[in-house]
Amino acid sequence: VHKMGIKDITICASSLGKAHDPIVPYIEDGTITGIQSSGVRGKIGEAISTGRLKNLAIMRSHGGRVRAIESGEVHIDIAFIGAPTCDEYGNMRANGGKSDCGVLSYAMVDAQYADKVVAVTDCLVPFPNIPASISMVDVDYVCVVDEIGNPAKIATGAAKPTTDVRKIMMADYCTKFVV
């Protein structure tokens, strides 16, 4: 996209952290001029805070992001969705590959409302990849890459698995209560 000279892009991500720091030069050169997210950390947050983003950054809750997309307040031209597993037709799942993650629910609204949807995976599996979190009916293209993410950079802050015994015990109690 950058090499093609496309400018004035708005990124509407569920969250941006240090794994996304490499986009800062594209903020500085005007390729990326807007950011809408539920959270921004690292060098991107610093770039926004120091006025290097041309337009205002818009922060919403995860649910607010969904509402904005569903209502048409936010229009998504192209959604690139990282999928730990995907078949050749675009059925995406969050597990079964080398980059397993939580659920793909944050990306479901993107898949349903974007003009074009690209499933990006590092684990192409045989059809049908079921049960699919995101169905092939919402996917236009499948792109296979070497690695969809770096867990060391993604699992930070609230998304970082804890080793704190007290927090693990609290989570265990909550699970027992709910179940």
Predicted regions and their residues:
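Conserved alpha/beta enzyme-core scaffold
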Residues: V1-V179
